[in-house]
Swiss-Prot record:
Function: Acetyltransferase; part of the gene cluster that mediates the biosynthesis of asperlin, a polyketide showing anti-inflammatory, antitumor and antibiotic activities. The first step of the asperlin biosynthesis is the production of the intermediate 2,4,6-octatrienoic acid by the highly redusing polyketide synthase alnA with cleavage of the PKS product by the esterase alnB. 2,4,6-octatrienoic acid is further converted to asperlin via several steps involving the remaining enzymes from the cluster.
Location within or outside the cell: Membrane
Keywords associated with the record: Acyltransferase, Glycoprotein, Membrane, Transferase, Transmembrane, Transmembrane helix
Keyword Nucleotide-binding: no
Taxon lineage: Eukaryota, Fungi, Dikarya, Ascomycota, Pezizomycotina
Protein name (database record): Acetyltransferase sirH
Enzyme Commission number(s) of this protein: 2.3.1.-
Membrane topology: Multi-pass membrane protein
Glycan attachment sites: N8
Length: 428
């Protein structure tokens, strides 16, 4: 019996390996519809009442989707953001339905939010209740940072959006989108392309570039990534607020204060976008509780830290599964635990610094900015190398550079049709 099970498992694994190695280019319809399909599964499986049935249906749907995608298709750079959102939707669904019950765990904290508790609804129709549950589910799955919900990120910045009228909000965000594109083009044309090798139609091994060039290119790409993410976020805000599906106060700035960039911990915890923070925090809490770690202990603090970055690594590795890179695919995962290790070293240095009587001040923070710049441009070289290896900087389906550096021309490079829509799900 045991031999049969092992033989059957081995043959199945070999069949999957063969299918994985003989995958075809992802069809156009799939590149445009996969992320909405994943989101639709998440929204629709929230509609049935709590119980094992919807968990089984959801697990079956997500498992089937992933098995089909991973064994049949490969994609290109334009699918980068879709891969991240597909795995993020899956992980968030598992946390909601397997590790909890969304109807109990989540509720809105504003009067404008939809509630699924009906007061005096003896005569309420099933259709009305179903539509209310659908609206609530859409609002829940459209909110990843918790604005207006009981899981709001306490580090969210608050700005002019709190007092702006709808018209002022739309105009200011449209202007910022145009400004971001202008700045990004300037950075690409006069800085990034100046450091990029002038090799037409040639593969560039990012790790072979001079050290200073690599650090400079990574820093510039970080700037361009932040501008791209900010623009997509603002486009989503214009859509939702313009259609009266949301209000300006639910769209605080995507990024935190640049003055906090004196530690790597602050980079990831306060400055960079916090779209997936709740996923990482929830996973860390589950592991910490499983270890019976008490709040305030080192075990509690660092189990949550490392689990959060490991989950982020898995999230980023989804890109390498769908967009193969023999040289840099592994880096999409290991970059995240590397940041956790740097944060640990930071904590040790801060502890012994305090013991030695070193006080926080301008000079210490100046050193912190240098520290953060060094480690970020060193480790972020892994995903930049990945993008380079899959043709992201040479015009082959480029998803971030609007123009290839081989010519610095004005030719527009096609991107995934749902790159913008991906970012709409999760920025409220």
């Amino acid at each position: 019996m045991a031999d049969y099970v092992i033989q059957n498992l081995t043959s199945n694994l070999q069949a999957m390996q063969y299918a994985y190695s003989s995958r075809e280019e992802m069809p156009v319809w799939a590149t445009k519809l996969l992320t909405p399909i994943f989101m639709a599964v998440a929204v629709l499986t929230t509609l049935p009442p709590p119980g094992p049935l919807r968990v089984i249906v959801g697990l079956t749907a997500f498992t089937s989707l992933w098995l089909h995608v991973l064994t049949h298709w490969v994609s290109g750079p334009a699918f980068f953001m879709d891969a991240i959102f597909m795995i993020s939707i899956t992980v968030r669904w598992l946390l909601m339905f397997v590790a909890g019950t969304p109807e109990i765990d989540y509720h809105q904290t504003t009067q404008s939010g939809t509630t699924i508790t009906h007061k005096g609804t003896k005569d309420s129709s099933t259709l009305r209740q179903g539509l209310t549950k659908l609206r609530w589910s859409v609002e829940l799955w459209s909110c990843w940072r918790g604005q207006g919900w009981n899981f709001v990120d306490q580090h969210l910045p608050r700005g002019a959006e709190r007092t702006q009228s709808r018209w002022e909000f739309l105009v200011s965000n449209a202007g910022r989108v145009l400004l971001n594109q202008y700045i990004s083009d300037l950075v690409r044309k006069y800085a990034f392309c100046a450091l990029w090798p002038a090799q037409v139609d040639a593969h560039v091994d990012f790790s072979s570039l001079p050290l200073l060039n690599r650090h400079g290119l990574v820093a510039l790409q970080l700037i361009r990534d932040s501008l791209m993410l900010d623009s997509e976020y603002r486009k989503a805000s214009i859509l939702f607020v313009g259609l009266h599906l949301s209000t300006p106060d639910r769209w605080p700035s995507l990024f935190g204060n640049m003055r906090d960039l004196y530690t790597v911990r602050n980079f990831w915890g306060r400055v960079w976008h916090q779209i997936f923070r709740q996923i990482f925090t929830r996973c860390g809490d589950i592991v910490a509780n499983a270890l019976n770690a008490q709040k305030g202990t080192l075990l509690y603090k660092y189990s949550r830290l490392y689990v959060g970055f490991l989950v982020s690594g898995v999230q980023h590795y989804a890109c390498a599964l769908l967009i193969p890179s023999a040289e840099y695919g592994w880096g999409m995962f290991w970059q995240m635990p590397a940041y956790a290790a740097v944060v640990t070293v930071e904590d040790i240095l801060k502890y012994y610094g305090r013991e030695a009587g070193i006080q926080d001040g301008n000079f210490v923070r100046f050193l912190g900015y240098i520290w953060t710049a060094y480690w970020m441009t060193l480790i972020y070289a892994l995903p930049v190398g990945f993008v380079s290896d899959i043709g992201g900087f040479t015009g082959d389906g480029n998803f971030q550079l609007s123009d290839p550096c081989v010519s610095c021309s004005s030719t527009s490079i096609p991107v995934s049709g749902f790159e913008s829509i991906d970012l709409e799900f999760g920025l409220w």
